[in-house]
Amino acid sequence: MSTYSRPVLLLLCGLLLLTLAIAVLNTLVPLWLAHENLPTWQVGMVSSSYFTGNLLGTLLTGKLIKRFGFNRSYYLASLIFAAGCVGLGLMVGFWSWMTWRFIAGVGCAMIWVVVESALMCSGTSRNRGRLLAAYMMVYYVGTVLGQLMISKLPTDLMSVLPWVTGMVLAAILPLLFTRIVNQGSEHHEATQVWPMLRLRHARLGVNGCIISGIVLGSLYGLMPLYLNHQGVSDSGIGFWMAVMVSAGIVGQWPIGKLADRYGRLLVLRVQVFVVILGCLAMLGNAAMAPALFILGAAGFTLYPVAMAWACEKVENHQLVAMNQALLLSYTIGSLLGPTFTAMLMQNYSDNLLFIMIASVAFIYLLMLLRKAGEHPTPVAHA
């Protein structure tokens, strides 16, 4: 059976449209609020409500998939996200937008859980690395294209909302032409999320997703601030961020293929070591282009490899719950990482960004080295 079957390709097409909409709104919502002269703390609260919605959506989706299946869960998640988009146009204000962004956050997290779980259930331990690499490539390409659309199209609220909402609704169409089946789970009770977090033999994957959240959350949220403090112009910041994200896109396919061929443990060790090297290069004032490229190529590919590691440790009927647990772990890391790193940067030095990332990467590397040889490679799930 081909790795990229018809259902997988249609699912990724829908994801691309959704990611475009998510990227556009995540960039423009803070700007729209700033144009309405809302104080910074309220803009931050609206952003936090979106991530709080992510947490709730992650926890709800497993039971939804068990009851309604992948297709109908995907439709519902897309409609919830579309409602969160439309609501922004009803009234501009702190409480109103905090509510609608919370709803959008729930819908986005549900979409991610459905798509990631469907990909996990569509593959085996021999090709999940490539499936997740394709997923992350689509996600990052959609993010970059979303930023390009912002630079080329009008960005006022009522100009953006109609086509963004239309894009979300259009993302439903591809899955109308296929049916994604959760094979092997029909005769099992829904697995709970919390026991997945405590599985000893999957702990490296869970920890890897937390570390990935810390690394990516810090790079996404604080790298622009670091570059700004170094005297880089706004256009220059956009360029260097594009270099880093593009490196993540380029790295997805080869790293996913290497993980499938040589094992995820070896690839994770190399990735984490390269992240540390990238941080040391930035701290040592090395040439920024190669330093950011290797940091992006290694850091932005941690999540799919760690996820594939954890998912190959559980049975097919546990994949949805495990995926929820991993996305929850990633979200927690992406919330906590930038918060603590920003405090350290403010009180001490901007270099703490790379010291923090290198430190958590080093801790994870020690875990990976300590676990060497403890867990045999499992039999591939059919």
From Swiss-Prot:
Keywords tagged on the record: Cell inner membrane, Cell membrane, Membrane, Transmembrane, Transmembrane helix, Transport
Taxonomic lineage from the root: Bacteria, Pseudomonadati, Pseudomonadota, Gammaproteobacteria, Enterobacterales
Membrane topology: Multi-pass membrane protein
GO cellular component: plasma membrane
Entry-linked NCBIfam families: PRK03633.1
Localization per record: Cell inner membrane
GO molecular function annotation: transmembrane transporter activity
Membrane-spanning parts: 8-28, 39-61, 75-95, 102-122, 131-151, 157-177, 204-224, 236-256, 265-284, 289-311, 325-345, 349-369
Family of this protein: Belongs to the major facilitator superfamily. YcaD (TC 2.A.1.26) family.
Keyword Transport belongs to the record: yes
InterPro entries: MFS, MFS_dom, MFS_trans_sf, MFS_YcaD, MFS_YcaD-like
Descriptive protein name: Uncharacterized MFS-type transporter Ent638_1421
Pfam families: MFS_1 (PF07690)
Location, primary (coarse class): membrane
